[in-house]
Amino acid sequence: MGWGLLIFMVQIGDTIVSFDLFQEYFCCNFSHCRGICCVEGDAGAPVLFEEVEKLEEALEVIASEMTPEARAVVDEQGVVYNDRDGDLVTSIVNGKDCVFASRDENGGCICLIEKAYREGRTPWRKPISCYLYPVRLRKVGDFTAVNFHKWDVCSSAFIKGRRKGIRAYEFLKEPLIERFGREWYDELLVVAEELKKQNML
């Protein structure tokens, strides 16, 4: 596949990977953040066109578990909408809460789609953008930019990652493989090892 180091970016195949993905420590800390990333922000989670049908199929499974407000939004505009940048995103309630978010018995935010997936009620986990977070993808010409999004609501994840010695690319192994494939991820590991040899990590 081949790779090349750019200033603060690494090219792997047809992707350009942010150096932050290698450098930053990251490990989700749900017990601290309580899943706030599902209910904060001013737009829904990015959705691929081919994921819309999967969202609609998942809706049939989890509709009864959604809040009345979320069901009303979905009834009015569907499971997705175009945000101010024209990107397709999940529908939201009151300008911030994902319609597929709910609360567990301890008040933490959970994804109803992923809950159904873990319980074997749906074959699909959730949108790849959610699975990949804090990575965000963006098309740049013929390339896909693999960017690392730093958000203050994830501050505890940076602390936990550093404490455990887990880099972002390691924590995100499974979603990165799901999105880009095993060969791509193996190349990412080669890059990481080379960066370590050069004392860049």
Residue ranges and their predicted role:
Residues W3-L201:
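Short loop/turn segments that flank or connect secondary-structure elements
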